Amino acid sequence: MTKHLKNNRGSAIVGLLLALIVLLLAANAVVITLCFRVGGGDHVPAPTEAPTMATEPIPTETETEPPTTTMPEPEHVVSTATILSTGDLVMHIPVVNTGAQSDGSYNFDSIFRYIKDYVSAADYSVVNLETTFAGTDNGFPYAGYPRFNCPDALADATKEAGFDMLLTANNHSFDTTLVGYKRTLEVVRGLGLETLGTYLSADEQKWTIVDINGIKVGMLCYTYATGLGPKGTPRLNGNAEIGEAGICNYFNYDNLPAFYSEVEGYLGEMKAAGAEATMIYVHWGVEYQLYANDNQIAMAQKLCDMGLDVIVGGHPHVVQPVDLLQSNEDPDHKTVILYSMGNAVSNQRFGN
């Protein structure tokens, strides 16, 4: 796969050589390596000799060979960036209880001890937060399924493990209503971690560009919704309505054209802002199914046709296949997709 993009560092041409995926099955993580070749400038052709007429040479006192000029080859610099993405942090109560300390506080550093080295080694690491940080002062006890609420110490543990971004758009984002929804963002952002997919206000930008080793990667995050409530805002997980418009990136399976139109607009904005590679995280599919369903496959192909470079899925709680999709619109474009990352942390051994 070769792409030619205008690099905003001068007039260099950037070639996206390949997005490589390596599965770390023990950690249910995916490492995406973006490799770019940066050219030093446009190729300048070597000078050619001017045409000559067949005439007798005119003798001169001293004949010398004209100097030859050799144009140097453009210098190429290879830049790489590794993005590690791992699955859902599903904080069931047995998992929450493992973090309880004798003084009443919580510490979850130990749950990342086997993947911390991988997380820290990547240039940029992402995890899906499938719980909320509502605290206990707002009438919500710590709880697991079906309405998740976890101690703030989990956010501290993700930072300690080396994560840079938490995905916050999923079907459990609104488990503790708008209070917990917004407090979750405040807790995570307060630690200096980035969030993607949910927002404190409708005015916030719905995508981000992360500069990783000089490579600008545009990112989006979406979750499925289960219809709209009376206020015209989405219901997540089939329960309470969000109630505020424009604070969550979501799609409805019964209105995918609206989703594609919105993503296409954001994709254009990211590229205009300098994104050299683009990726989207999508919370979709059917839980506990080992293979992507028809909706996932069709949506993935459409996103590939739109020009996204990488698609990473979540929600099924199991690892689903990796594939390399060929665009129907551009013969030179391919998209790497992992249909589902599975769980990173949970108390699930079997479906349901």
Q: At which residue positions do the language-model features occur?
A:
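Juxtamembrane extracytosolic/periplasmic "stalk" immediately C-terminal to the first targeting helix
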Residues: 44-49
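Acidic, metal/ion-coordinating pockets
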Residues: 15-41, 52-53, 58-59, 65-352
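Intrinsically disordered, low-complexity polyampholyte segments enriched for Lys and acidic residues
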Residues: 3-6, 61-65
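N-terminal Lys/Arg-rich, disordered targeting/topogenic segments
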Residues: 1-13
